[in-house]
Amino acid sequence: MCDNKKPTVKEIAELCLKKFESLPKTGKPTANQWTILAGIVEFNRNTEACQLVSLGCGTKCIGESKLCPNGLILNDSHAEVLARRGFLRFLYQELKQDRIFHWNSTLSTYDMDEHVEFHFLSTQTPCGDACILEEEQPAARAKRQRLDEDSEMVYTGAKLISDLSDDPMLQTPGALRTKPGRGERTLSMSCSDKIARWNVIGVQGALLDVLISKPIYFSSLNFCCDDAQLESLERAIFKRFDCRTFKHTRFQPQRPQINIDPGIRFEFSQRSDWQPSPNGLIWSQVPEELRPYEISVNGKRQGVTKKKMKTSQAALAISKYKLFLTFLELVKFNPKLSEMFDQQLSDPERIAYASCKDLARDYQFAWREIKEKYFLQWTKKPHELLDFNPMSNK
């Protein structure tokens, strides 16, 4: 039970940390390794019940040359993104039941229980704009800061996306960035930018948006770390777009409650003398037979033999390919949905992933407008990465 009809940072963190502690030791950081933990908690305002529904740990991304055209490899394995993708697994499972989703026969879609909300937590400030503390002097805002103990400015390693400067490490507040890293540059946007996107268009993504009546937003964003700054978090997630108009009936920019509690400790938080763990961890609130807990290495499932590395057996349950199959399976075996999508999905084995995403017309229209108004410099991945179908990996 959560007090005051809203879960506190401490209550949310307790659910996340207890679940992490209960998971098998395999895949977790070893001695002198650190990682980031992120989780999503469901809260019912009517019953005041809280439950953890998704957990992710990770710090890695793959470079542009390693992007997979068949949807088998995760591009982005930062904790925030893993937790969100694990959340998608949970939502698909819930659509098979009659607990938080209910069929709306008038709209031919699913409504989510109005008493249910979701709260996000991370043990570290999201990479990108949220890590930058704006300086008082405007002329100095874009000054290059060194990564040393004397720097008074919170530093992000996320790389600036701009045609106006040759220096991708300029600490410019409010700018779009790709993920940090010393290797090949990635096309994955920073976690600050992704959370800002979810704050406008929802966390459900295009495929799930086809099935539900309203986008799903986080009611609160919670951070338990020493370096989190409320001003920077608010700017990164919604304030940097305050001056830009966006008119859409279904999707609206949110102003979620942002909470910080530096007193909560995660045993594997980042330390300067430790190395980042190479593994990603994902847990979802789904039945045991569906394998709720997985370990990722380089965007693939740990333990897969070299012979099967390029097959669907290497794909995590939260990969594009596996979530696509989950979507198609849900539609196929749900009489209401199969009737509704009878024409569009007449040949489900050969329909392209991109074609299914395009079924979410409202979502795609809004996303195009959002990119024009908010995220003009959002990276573009090759379209052929979305052309796979269920038969691509068989």
UniProtKB/Swiss-Prot annotation:
Entry GO CC: cytoplasm; nucleolus
Family that this chain belongs to: Belongs to the ADAT1 family.
Reactions performed catalytically: adenosine(37) in tRNA(Ala) + H2O + H(+) = inosine(37) in tRNA(Ala) + NH4(+)
Organism: Drosophila melanogaster
Annotated ranges, domain A to I editase: 54-388
Cofactor(s) needed: 1D-myo-inositol hexakisphosphate
Tissue expression notes: Widely expressed in early embryos, and later concentrates in the central nervous system.
Name of the protein described by the UniProt record: tRNA-specific adenosine deaminase 1
